[in-house]
Amino acid sequence: MEVTHGRGYVYSIQYHIVWCVKYRHKVITEQIENRLIEILSKIAEDNGFQILECNTDKDHIHLLVNCSPQHYIPDMIKALKGVSARLLMKEFGEELKKKLWGGHLWNPSYFVATVSENTEEQIRKYIQNQKRK
C-alpha cells in the first residue's frame, strides 16, 4: 500500500467500490466493458484519483480506488456512475435499451469499504477473479 505525502499530511486511502446494473440485468458485454474501463480511467484521471483495479461481471463492477483526503466518496461515485452511464447509453443505447428501460444504466445504490494494507491483496485478487466464479 503506497503512502502519499501532501502539504502538511501523509495519507494512504483506498476504497473497494461496487455498483450494479439497474435490475441486475446482464448487459455488460466485452465491448461495453472495454469502453466502460476507458471511461472510468479518464474520469479518475480528470478528478485526481487512481483506479488500481477494475473488473466487471455482466451485471456489476468492482473498483479498487486510491484517492486523497480531499476526495468526497459520494462525489467520486456520482462522477463515475453518471458520466459512464451517459456515455455508454449514448454509444450502446440501442443494445442496452433492449433490457433496460427508463434510460437508467446503473442501480442508484453502491457499496463502498475502506481497504487496509492487511486486506489490499485479498481485495485485488477478489476483483481480478470476478469473471471466474
Predicted region positions:
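Basic nucleic-acid-binding interfaces
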Residues: 1-133
